[in-house]
Protein backbone atom coordinates (compact mmCIF):
# COMPACT_ATOMS: atom_id res chain seq x y z
CA UNK A 1 0.00 0.00 0.00
CA UNK A 2 2.37 2.68 -1.23
CA UNK A 3 1.16 6.16 -0.28
CA UNK A 4 1.41 9.02 -2.75
CA UNK A 5 3.80 11.93 -2.32
CA UNK A 6 1.50 14.91 -1.82
CA UNK A 7 3.87 17.33 -3.53
CA UNK A 8 3.25 15.59 -6.86
CA UNK A 9 -0.49 16.22 -6.93
CA UNK A 10 -0.90 19.79 -5.68
CA UNK A 11 -2.57 22.40 -7.86
CA UNK A 12 -1.25 25.96 -8.04
CA UNK A 13 -3.99 27.11 -5.66
CA UNK A 14 -3.12 24.38 -3.17
CA UNK A 15 0.57 25.29 -3.28
CA UNK A 16 -0.37 28.88 -2.55
CA UNK A 17 -2.50 27.83 0.43
CA UNK A 18 0.29 25.50 1.58
CA UNK A 19 2.71 28.42 1.71
CA UNK A 20 0.20 30.55 3.60
CA UNK A 21 -0.45 27.86 6.21
CA UNK A 22 3.25 27.20 6.74
CA UNK A 23 4.10 30.90 7.02
CA UNK A 24 1.36 31.24 9.62
CA UNK A 25 2.69 28.16 11.39
CA UNK A 26 6.25 29.49 11.59
CA UNK A 27 5.02 32.73 13.15
CA UNK A 28 3.20 30.70 15.81
CA UNK A 29 6.32 28.63 16.51
CA UNK A 30 8.31 31.82 17.08
CA UNK A 31 5.68 33.35 19.37
CA UNK A 32 4.91 30.16 21.28
CA UNK A 33 8.03 28.53 22.69
CA UNK A 34 6.48 27.64 26.05
CA UNK A 35 3.07 26.35 27.07
CA UNK A 36 2.17 29.74 28.58
CA UNK A 37 3.13 31.56 25.39
CA UNK A 38 1.10 29.09 23.32
CA UNK A 39 -1.99 29.73 25.43
CA UNK A 40 -1.59 33.51 25.22
CA UNK A 41 -1.14 33.26 21.46
CA UNK A 42 -4.18 31.00 21.13
CA UNK A 43 -6.40 33.32 23.16
CA UNK A 44 -5.33 36.27 21.02
CA UNK A 45 -6.13 34.40 17.80
CA UNK A 46 -9.47 32.89 18.82
CA UNK A 47 -10.82 36.12 20.31
CA UNK A 48 -10.33 37.71 16.88
CA UNK A 49 -12.72 35.03 15.59
CA UNK A 50 -15.39 35.74 18.18
CA UNK A 51 -14.54 33.24 20.91
CA UNK A 52 -15.54 34.33 24.43
CA UNK A 53 -14.13 33.26 27.78
CA UNK A 54 -16.49 30.74 29.35
CA UNK A 55 -16.17 32.36 32.78
CA UNK A 56 -17.75 35.53 31.35
CA UNK A 57 -20.80 33.73 29.93
CA UNK A 58 -23.97 34.38 31.93
CA UNK A 59 -26.65 33.43 29.40
CA UNK A 60 -27.35 30.09 27.77
CA UNK A 61 -25.35 28.93 24.76
CA UNK A 62 -26.77 28.08 21.34
CA UNK A 63 -25.56 26.65 18.05
CA UNK A 64 -22.84 28.81 16.52
CA UNK A 65 -21.58 30.20 19.82
CA UNK A 66 -17.83 30.09 20.40
CA UNK A 67 -16.30 29.76 23.86
CA UNK A 68 -13.00 28.87 25.50
CA UNK A 69 -11.62 28.06 28.93
CA UNK A 70 -8.05 28.36 30.22
CA UNK A 71 -6.47 26.28 32.98
CA UNK A 72 -3.77 28.12 34.94
CA UNK A 73 -2.46 29.80 31.81
CA UNK A 74 -0.99 26.53 30.52
CA UNK A 75 -3.86 24.60 28.92
CA UNK A 76 -6.84 25.75 26.87
CA UNK A 77 -10.03 24.21 25.52
CA UNK A 78 -12.15 25.89 22.85
CA UNK A 79 -15.59 24.93 21.57
CA UNK A 80 -17.79 25.78 18.59
CA UNK A 81 -21.31 24.81 19.65
CA UNK A 82 -23.01 22.61 17.07
CA UNK A 83 -26.63 22.11 16.06
CA UNK A 84 -26.92 18.70 17.72
CA UNK A 85 -27.36 18.39 21.49
CA UNK A 86 -24.06 18.22 23.34
CA UNK A 87 -24.99 14.84 24.79
CA UNK A 88 -24.68 13.43 21.26
CA UNK A 89 -20.95 13.98 21.58
CA UNK A 90 -18.28 16.28 20.17
CA UNK A 91 -15.61 16.09 17.49
CA UNK A 92 -12.41 16.73 19.42
CA UNK A 93 -8.90 17.66 18.32
CA UNK A 94 -6.42 17.28 21.17
CA UNK A 95 -2.71 18.12 21.20
CA UNK A 96 -0.07 19.10 23.74
CA UNK A 97 1.84 22.37 23.86
CA UNK A 98 4.68 21.47 26.21
CA UNK A 99 7.98 20.39 24.67
CA UNK A 100 11.26 18.93 25.98
CA UNK A 101 13.41 21.68 27.48
CA UNK A 102 15.59 22.62 30.43
CA UNK A 103 13.97 24.22 33.49
CA UNK A 104 15.61 26.55 36.00
CA UNK A 105 15.60 25.30 39.60
CA UNK A 106 14.08 27.28 42.48
CA UNK A 107 17.43 28.19 44.10
CA UNK A 108 19.46 28.45 40.89
CA UNK A 109 21.88 31.36 40.87
CA UNK A 110 25.47 30.62 41.86
CA UNK A 111 29.05 31.58 41.03
CA UNK A 112 32.02 29.29 40.45
CA UNK A 113 35.47 30.75 39.73
CA UNK A 114 34.15 34.05 38.38
CA UNK A 115 31.49 32.43 36.20
CA UNK A 116 27.78 32.79 37.03
CA UNK A 117 25.34 29.95 36.35
CA UNK A 118 21.70 29.01 36.70
CA UNK A 119 21.23 25.52 38.14
CA UNK A 120 18.81 23.48 36.03
CA UNK A 121 16.67 20.36 35.81
CA UNK A 122 15.75 19.03 32.37
CA UNK A 123 12.10 18.42 31.43
CA UNK A 124 10.92 15.52 29.29
CA UNK A 125 12.89 12.96 27.34
CA UNK A 126 16.02 14.53 25.92
CA UNK A 127 19.41 13.42 24.68
CA UNK A 128 21.35 15.64 27.07
CA UNK A 129 24.39 15.88 24.82
CA UNK A 130 22.28 17.65 22.17
CA UNK A 131 21.77 20.69 24.41
CA UNK A 132 25.38 21.79 24.90
CA UNK A 133 27.11 24.59 22.94
CA UNK A 134 23.83 25.88 21.49
CA UNK A 135 22.58 29.48 21.74
CA UNK A 136 19.80 29.29 24.31
CA UNK A 137 17.03 31.67 25.38
CA UNK A 138 15.27 32.17 28.70
CA UNK A 139 11.46 32.30 28.72
CA UNK A 140 8.93 32.28 31.53
CA UNK A 141 7.45 34.26 34.38
CA UNK A 142 8.59 35.69 37.70
CA UNK A 143 5.76 36.06 40.23
CA UNK A 144 6.37 38.35 43.19
CA UNK A 145 4.69 37.92 46.56
CA UNK A 146 2.34 40.84 45.82
CA UNK A 147 0.98 38.85 42.86
CA UNK A 148 2.80 40.84 40.19
CA UNK A 149 3.62 38.63 37.18
CA UNK A 150 6.68 39.62 35.16
CA UNK A 151 7.09 37.93 31.78
CA UNK A 152 10.63 36.95 30.79
CA UNK A 153 11.91 36.53 27.24
CA UNK A 154 15.66 36.94 26.77
CA UNK A 155 17.56 35.68 23.75
CA UNK A 156 15.09 35.96 20.88
CA UNK A 157 15.69 39.50 19.60
CA UNK A 158 18.68 40.21 17.36
CA UNK A 159 20.31 42.44 19.98
CA UNK A 160 19.49 40.18 22.96
CA UNK A 161 22.21 38.25 24.74
CA UNK A 162 21.95 34.47 24.54
CA UNK A 163 23.06 31.77 26.97
CA UNK A 164 24.88 28.46 26.66
CA UNK A 165 25.63 25.14 28.33
CA UNK A 166 29.35 24.48 27.89
CA UNK A 167 31.09 21.25 26.88
CA UNK A 168 34.57 19.85 27.46
CA UNK A 169 37.07 20.56 24.69
CA UNK A 170 37.93 17.57 22.49
CA UNK A 171 41.62 17.85 23.46
CA UNK A 172 40.82 16.78 27.04
CA UNK A 173 37.80 14.59 26.36
CA UNK A 174 39.45 11.18 26.14
CA UNK A 175 37.59 9.71 29.11
CA UNK A 176 34.38 11.54 28.26
CA UNK A 177 34.36 10.05 24.76
CA UNK A 178 34.48 6.54 26.21
CA UNK A 179 31.17 7.01 28.03
CA UNK A 180 27.78 5.88 26.77
CA UNK A 181 25.78 8.58 25.00
CA UNK A 182 23.36 8.71 27.94
CA UNK A 183 26.23 9.58 30.30
CA UNK A 184 28.42 11.84 28.15
CA UNK A 185 26.60 14.87 29.57
CA UNK A 186 25.11 14.41 33.03
CA UNK A 187 21.99 16.22 34.15
CA UNK A 188 23.87 18.18 36.80
CA UNK A 189 26.21 19.54 34.11
CA UNK A 190 23.40 21.17 32.15
CA UNK A 191 23.76 24.41 34.11
CA UNK A 192 23.35 27.61 32.12
CA UNK A 193 26.27 30.03 31.80
CA UNK A 194 24.81 33.52 32.25
CA UNK A 195 27.63 35.89 33.21
CA UNK A 196 31.33 36.52 33.91
CA UNK A 197 31.62 40.24 34.69
CA UNK A 198 31.89 41.27 38.35
CA UNK A 199 29.94 44.09 39.91
CA UNK A 200 32.04 47.25 40.12
CA UNK A 201 32.64 49.37 43.21
CA UNK A 202 30.70 52.24 41.67
CA UNK A 203 27.71 49.90 41.36
CA UNK A 204 27.71 48.98 45.05
CA UNK A 205 30.31 46.21 45.34
CA UNK A 206 31.30 45.46 48.94
CA UNK A 207 35.01 45.04 49.56
CA UNK A 208 34.49 41.58 51.05
CA UNK A 209 32.07 40.45 48.30
CA UNK A 210 33.00 36.88 47.32
CA UNK A 211 30.48 36.44 44.50
CA UNK A 212 30.86 39.67 42.54
CA UNK A 213 29.79 38.10 39.23
CA UNK A 214 26.64 36.67 40.79
CA UNK A 215 25.98 40.06 42.37
CA UNK A 216 26.25 41.74 38.98
CA UNK A 217 23.83 39.26 37.41
CA UNK A 218 21.41 39.88 40.25
CA UNK A 219 21.73 43.65 39.78
CA UNK A 220 20.85 43.30 36.09
CA UNK A 221 17.82 41.16 36.93
CA UNK A 222 16.74 43.70 39.53
CA UNK A 223 17.11 46.57 37.07
CA UNK A 224 15.15 44.79 34.33
CA UNK A 225 12.57 42.84 36.31
CA UNK A 226 12.52 44.48 39.75
CA UNK A 227 13.23 41.09 41.30
CA UNK A 228 15.14 39.88 44.32
CA UNK A 229 16.99 36.58 44.50
CA UNK A 230 14.16 35.21 46.66
CA UNK A 231 11.80 35.71 43.71
CA UNK A 232 13.40 32.73 41.97
CA UNK A 233 11.36 30.67 44.44
CA UNK A 234 8.15 31.68 42.67
CA UNK A 235 9.46 31.80 39.12
CA UNK A 236 8.94 29.42 36.20
CA UNK A 237 11.85 29.90 33.83
CA UNK A 238 12.34 27.64 30.82
CA UNK A 239 15.50 27.32 28.72
CA UNK A 240 14.82 26.77 25.02
CA UNK A 241 16.85 27.07 21.81
CA UNK A 242 17.24 30.69 20.71
CA UNK A 243 16.20 31.59 17.19
CA UNK A 244 13.33 31.55 14.76
CA UNK A 245 11.75 28.75 12.76
CA UNK A 246 13.50 28.49 9.40
CA UNK A 247 12.80 27.03 6.00
CA UNK A 248 14.96 23.94 5.53
CA UNK A 249 16.39 22.64 2.27
CA UNK A 250 17.35 24.34 -0.98
CA UNK A 251 13.78 23.79 -2.15
CA UNK A 252 12.37 25.25 1.10
CA UNK A 253 10.19 22.14 1.42
CA UNK A 254 10.78 21.64 5.15
CA UNK A 255 10.74 23.56 8.44
CA UNK A 256 13.50 23.46 11.04
CA UNK A 257 12.33 24.67 14.44
CA UNK A 258 12.20 24.00 18.16
CA UNK A 259 9.12 22.46 19.74
CA UNK A 260 7.43 20.95 16.69
CA UNK A 261 6.59 18.01 18.96
CA UNK A 262 3.77 18.70 19.44
CA UNK A 263 3.12 22.27 18.36
CA UNK A 264 2.94 21.22 14.73
CA UNK A 265 -0.24 19.35 15.66
CA UNK A 266 -1.39 21.99 18.15
CA UNK A 267 -1.21 24.90 15.73
CA UNK A 268 -2.66 23.02 12.74
CA UNK A 269 -5.51 21.89 15.02
CA UNK A 270 -6.00 25.52 16.05
CA UNK A 271 -6.02 26.67 12.41
CA UNK A 272 -8.59 24.01 11.53
CA UNK A 273 -10.77 25.00 14.47
CA UNK A 274 -10.68 28.66 13.45
CA UNK A 275 -11.57 27.86 9.84
CA UNK A 276 -14.72 25.80 10.41
CA UNK A 277 -18.19 27.26 10.88
CA UNK A 278 -21.76 25.99 11.10
CA UNK A 279 -21.05 22.46 12.39
CA UNK A 280 -23.58 19.73 13.17
CA UNK A 281 -21.71 18.26 16.14
CA UNK A 282 -19.95 20.55 18.60
CA UNK A 283 -16.31 21.02 17.61
CA UNK A 284 -13.62 21.13 20.26
CA UNK A 285 -9.89 21.76 20.30
CA UNK A 286 -7.98 21.16 23.51
CA UNK A 287 -4.30 22.06 23.90
CA UNK A 288 -2.76 20.72 27.09
CA UNK A 289 0.40 20.83 29.16
CA UNK A 290 2.59 18.15 30.79
CA UNK A 291 2.29 15.42 28.13
CA UNK A 292 6.06 15.06 27.98
CA UNK A 293 6.15 13.98 31.64
CA UNK A 294 3.04 11.81 31.76
CA UNK A 295 0.13 14.28 31.42
CA UNK A 296 0.08 14.71 35.19
CA UNK A 297 -0.91 17.65 37.37
CA UNK A 298 -3.66 20.24 37.13
CA UNK A 299 -2.74 21.31 33.59
CA UNK A 300 -2.14 17.82 32.19
CA UNK A 301 -4.73 15.67 30.44
CA UNK A 302 -5.17 13.52 33.56
CA UNK A 303 -6.72 16.48 35.40
CA UNK A 304 -10.49 17.07 35.58
CA UNK A 305 -10.19 20.38 33.72
CA UNK A 306 -11.71 19.13 30.47
CA UNK A 307 -14.48 17.21 32.18
CA UNK A 308 -15.37 20.24 34.31
CA UNK A 309 -15.55 22.50 31.26
CA UNK A 310 -17.83 20.05 29.45
CA UNK A 311 -20.09 20.04 32.52
CA UNK A 312 -20.28 23.84 32.30
CA UNK A 313 -21.21 23.62 28.62
CA UNK A 314 -23.94 21.06 29.26
CA UNK A 315 -25.37 23.29 31.98
CA UNK A 316 -25.39 26.29 29.62
CA UNK A 317 -26.94 24.41 26.68
CA UNK A 318 -29.20 21.70 28.09
CA UNK A 319 -29.35 22.33 31.83
CA UNK A 320 -27.35 20.71 34.59
CA UNK A 321 -27.20 16.93 34.23
CA UNK A 322 -24.42 14.59 35.28
CA UNK A 323 -25.82 11.93 32.96
CA UNK A 324 -25.69 14.26 29.95
CA UNK A 325 -22.09 15.15 30.77
CA UNK A 326 -21.19 11.46 30.74
CA UNK A 327 -23.05 10.96 27.48
CA UNK A 328 -21.34 13.98 25.91
CA UNK A 329 -17.95 12.51 26.74
CA UNK A 330 -18.70 8.91 25.80
CA UNK A 331 -20.35 9.83 22.50
CA UNK A 332 -17.44 12.04 21.43
CA UNK A 333 -14.90 11.17 18.76
CA UNK A 334 -11.33 12.37 18.95
CA UNK A 335 -8.11 12.76 17.05
CA UNK A 336 -5.30 12.67 19.59
CA UNK A 337 -3.02 14.88 17.57
CA UNK A 338 0.59 13.98 18.26
CA UNK A 339 3.65 13.59 16.09
CA UNK A 340 5.10 10.41 14.59
CA UNK A 341 8.68 9.40 13.93
CA UNK A 342 9.53 10.05 10.29
CA UNK A 343 11.48 7.38 8.44
CA UNK A 344 15.13 8.45 8.44
CA UNK A 345 17.35 6.73 5.83
CA UNK A 346 20.37 7.56 8.00
CA UNK A 347 18.92 5.32 10.74
CA UNK A 348 16.98 2.85 8.63
CA UNK A 349 17.74 0.02 11.06
CA UNK A 350 15.29 1.55 13.58
CA UNK A 351 12.29 1.34 11.24
CA UNK A 352 10.15 -1.28 9.54
CA UNK A 353 9.48 0.41 6.20
CA UNK A 354 6.02 -1.03 5.55
CA UNK A 355 4.83 0.49 8.83
CA UNK A 356 6.82 3.72 8.82
CA UNK A 357 5.73 7.32 8.29
CA UNK A 358 7.37 9.14 5.39
CA UNK A 359 7.95 12.81 4.69
CA UNK A 360 5.56 14.37 2.20
CA UNK A 361 2.96 11.60 2.32
CA UNK A 362 0.48 13.36 4.53
CA UNK A 363 -1.18 13.13 7.92
CA UNK A 364 -0.07 10.09 9.93
CA UNK A 365 -2.51 7.85 11.82
CA UNK A 366 -1.34 5.46 14.53
CA UNK A 367 -3.87 2.75 15.37
CA UNK A 368 -1.85 2.18 18.52
CA UNK A 369 1.28 3.49 20.21
CA UNK A 370 2.83 2.10 23.39
CA UNK A 371 5.93 -0.07 23.63
CA UNK A 372 6.85 -3.62 22.66
CA UNK A 373 3.61 -5.62 23.14
CA UNK A 374 1.50 -2.43 22.76
CA UNK A 375 2.03 -1.75 26.47
CA UNK A 376 0.28 1.41 27.62
CA UNK A 377 -1.33 2.11 24.26
CA UNK A 378 -4.72 3.20 23.05
CA UNK A 379 -5.70 0.69 20.37
CA UNK A 380 -8.32 2.31 18.13
CA UNK A 381 -11.30 0.28 16.91
CA UNK A 382 -11.49 -0.84 13.29
CA UNK A 383 -14.97 0.67 12.91
CA UNK A 384 -13.61 4.06 13.93
CA UNK A 385 -10.63 3.70 11.60
CA UNK A 386 -13.03 3.22 8.71
CA UNK A 387 -15.02 6.29 9.72
CA UNK A 388 -11.86 8.39 9.89
CA UNK A 389 -10.75 7.11 6.49
CA UNK A 390 -14.11 8.15 5.02
CA UNK A 391 -13.71 11.63 6.49
CA UNK A 392 -10.22 12.00 5.00
CA UNK A 393 -11.32 10.67 1.61
CA UNK A 394 -14.25 13.08 1.56
CA UNK A 395 -11.84 15.99 1.06
CA UNK A 396 -9.03 14.07 -0.66
CA UNK A 397 -6.62 14.46 2.26
CA UNK A 398 -3.26 12.71 1.88
CA UNK A 399 -2.74 10.37 4.82
CA UNK A 400 -0.76 7.32 5.90
CA UNK A 401 -0.86 4.74 8.70
CA UNK A 402 2.29 3.99 10.68
CA UNK A 403 3.89 2.72 13.85
CA UNK A 404 6.62 4.47 15.82
CA UNK A 405 9.42 2.06 14.87
CA UNK A 406 10.46 -1.59 15.08
CA UNK A 407 8.43 -3.62 17.56
CA UNK A 408 10.98 -4.28 20.30
CA UNK A 409 13.13 -1.18 19.86
CA UNK A 410 11.28 1.20 22.17
CA UNK A 411 8.01 3.08 22.17
CA UNK A 412 6.05 6.11 23.21
CA UNK A 413 2.68 7.33 24.35
CA UNK A 414 0.22 10.20 23.94
CA UNK A 415 -2.93 11.58 25.57
CA UNK A 416 -5.13 9.19 23.56
CA UNK A 417 -5.60 6.55 26.25
CA UNK A 418 -6.61 9.18 28.81
CA UNK A 419 -9.51 10.46 26.72
CA UNK A 420 -10.43 6.91 25.74
CA UNK A 421 -11.09 6.26 29.43
CA UNK A 422 -14.37 8.15 28.95
CA UNK A 423 -15.43 5.52 26.43
CA UNK A 424 -15.04 7.79 23.42
CA UNK A 425 -13.48 6.74 20.12
CA UNK A 426 -9.87 7.97 19.88
CA UNK A 427 -7.05 7.53 17.40
CA UNK A 428 -3.61 9.12 17.31
CA UNK A 429 -2.92 11.32 14.32
CA UNK A 430 -0.19 13.80 13.56
CA UNK A 431 2.79 14.90 11.52
CA UNK A 432 5.97 12.92 10.83
CA UNK A 433 9.03 14.53 12.43
CA UNK A 434 12.77 14.01 11.90
CA UNK A 435 15.04 14.41 14.96
CA UNK A 436 12.08 14.28 17.34
CA UNK A 437 12.86 15.66 20.83
CA UNK A 438 16.05 17.30 19.59
CA UNK A 439 16.49 21.05 20.14
CA UNK A 440 15.77 21.53 16.43
CA UNK A 441 13.22 19.26 14.74
CA UNK A 442 12.31 18.92 11.06
CA UNK A 443 8.89 18.65 9.41
CA UNK A 444 7.66 18.60 5.81
CA UNK A 445 5.59 21.58 4.72
CA UNK A 446 3.36 19.21 2.77
CA UNK A 447 2.62 17.23 5.93
CA UNK A 448 1.89 20.41 7.89
CA UNK A 449 -0.60 21.40 5.21
CA UNK A 450 -2.21 17.95 5.07
CA UNK A 451 -2.55 17.95 8.86
CA UNK A 452 -4.47 21.21 8.66
CA UNK A 453 -6.66 19.82 5.87
CA UNK A 454 -7.18 16.53 7.69
CA UNK A 455 -8.14 18.12 10.99
CA UNK A 456 -10.59 20.42 9.23
CA UNK A 457 -12.12 17.48 7.37
CA UNK A 458 -12.47 15.58 10.64
CA UNK A 459 -14.41 18.43 12.25
CA UNK A 460 -16.72 18.72 9.24
CA UNK A 461 -17.26 15.09 8.23
CA UNK A 462 -17.36 12.93 11.36
Task: Give the ranges of each region predicted by the language model.
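N-terminal hydrophobic/helix-forming segments and targeting peptides
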Residues: 1-462
Amino acid sequence: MERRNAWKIYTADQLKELDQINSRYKVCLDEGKTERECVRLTVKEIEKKGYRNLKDIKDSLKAGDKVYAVCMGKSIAMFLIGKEPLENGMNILGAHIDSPRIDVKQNPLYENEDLAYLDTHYYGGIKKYQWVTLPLALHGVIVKTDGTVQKVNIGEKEDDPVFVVTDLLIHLAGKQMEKKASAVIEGEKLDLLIGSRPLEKEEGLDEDEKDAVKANVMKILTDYYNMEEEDFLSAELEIVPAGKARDCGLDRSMILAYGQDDRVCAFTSLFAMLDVEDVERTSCCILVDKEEIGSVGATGMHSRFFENVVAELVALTEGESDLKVRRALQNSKMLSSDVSAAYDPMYAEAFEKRSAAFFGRGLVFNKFTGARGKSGSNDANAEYLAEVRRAMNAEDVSYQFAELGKVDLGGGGTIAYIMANYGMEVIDSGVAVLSMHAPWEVTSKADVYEAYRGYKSFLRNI
